[in-house]
Amino acid sequence: MRSLLNCLKITTDMRHILIIGAGKSTGVLVDYLLKKSEEENLKLLIADKNIDQAKLLSQNHKNADAVELDIFNEDQRRAYVQKASIVISMLPARFHIEVARDCITYGKSMVTASYVSPEMQALDEDAIKKNLIFMNEIGVDPGIDHMSAMQVLDRIRAKGGKILLFESFTGGLVAPENDDNLWNYKFTWNPRNVVTAGQGGAAKFIQEGQYKYIPYHKLFRRTEFLDVDGYGRFEAYANRNSLKYRSVYGLDDILTLYRGTMRRVGFSKAWNMFVQLGMTDDTYVIEDSENMSYRDFVNSFLPYSPTDSAELKMRHILKIDQDDIMWDKLVELDLFNATKKVELKEATPAKILQKILEDSWTLQSGEKDMIVMYHKFGYELDGHKKQIDSTMVCLGDGEMQTAMAKTVGLPVAIAALKILNGEINTPGVQIPITAPIYEPILKELEDYGIRFRESEMEYLGYNPLSL
């Protein structure tokens, strides 16, 4: 590892950006800043526990250095933070707080793409006192969803309109040209988040003034359908708490507020089979999981029978026939393979299911992903009810320039540079929901193909028959 002193050499005219975490979305972030590094006098220090990954992202560029960093090594971490002009944390969300406390200590502004945790929010007063900007939730979801929604909401309100409905959906999916399995899905981000999605409490939202709740075991059978021009029909299941941003968005009196996750039609019904069987459970460990075959794993959730096969028992439990597309989807995953081993010690059902799915759903070299976002706004203005649909589709450009990496990394990078240049200057722990923040960032994102298309029509209200 390069010595600490060598990496902390600075020149007075360079502005130093410390980037902690060299994960999937950091490459796009680094690319953006390196292209700006000459005109903006930027020097990047990419720090990660995997020095090889950090070096790869640095591209041997004269304005980028890579270092190995153990985030739990306080002396090392603080030394890097102390010398930075601004800090970007691309770490898993649970580790941001240690970096944030260092930033308070040494007077550094900070940017993350993660949700604001209670611990992060508790630093708001200290950040304001020190005139520091702690920008969070500036990836894609959360991030671009906030900015694009607030842009339309503020525009409607500026005209005197009253917001009646707001629905927002985002999905990380496989690009159409690589959509080649029966599930119409491949992992484009953290597989664990997909397997455990919806757990931890009932989904909560408002429809036509009524609070609605969907428990986990019903979540994937209560879906909304939506169409995106040029990309066909999608479905969406409810996020856990659609009401989290009601006050933040200024929607306390809204009649319908619903946020969800997008998939291709048919995914949720098929995924519900795993939920009903218990395969997505992450609360207990399967005995002797290391030596189980995939077939053993499936059989462990089925009743004992001295005569019936696992396949027959599965179809009976799920009430599906052999010629049902749901059955074909299960068979496609090679779930009943008696020779493939789980090879995971003390694994939960969710972890085992994740491994099985990764065999089939991992993006291969050359395959591309896609981010789809859909907002629906219902409002009343001058006695007329209208609706705006706003959609965004971003396609990946390969393994290092995935759609997910672009839509996470670019807004983080743009925000960091604007903070560094004083264009974003309101201190405190915050998210990008004010016009001085979202307007210039959304405008610049259009240069990278991340743009929203709007259509306006008469608003007919939410269908009361579905309540």
Over which residues does each language-model region extend?
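ADP-ribose/adenylate-binding Rossmann-like module
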Residues: D102-M120
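Helix N-cap at the beta1-alpha1 junction of Rossmann-like dinucleotide-binding domains, i.e.
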Residues: K49-D52, S117
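Hydrophobic/small residue at the entry helix of a nucleotide-binding pocket
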Residues: S25-L29
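Rossmann-fold NAD(P)-binding glycine/threonine-rich loop
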Residues: S114-N136
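Conserved N-terminal Rossmann-fold NAD(P)-binding element of oxidoreductases
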Residues: I17-K24
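C-terminal catalytic/substrate-binding lobe primarily of soluble NAD(P)-dependent oxidoreductases
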Residues: A158-L467
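Rossmann-fold cofactor-recognition segment
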Residues: N60-N73
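Conserved Rossmann-fold cofactor-binding substructure of NAD(P)-dependent oxidoreductases
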Residues: I71-K83
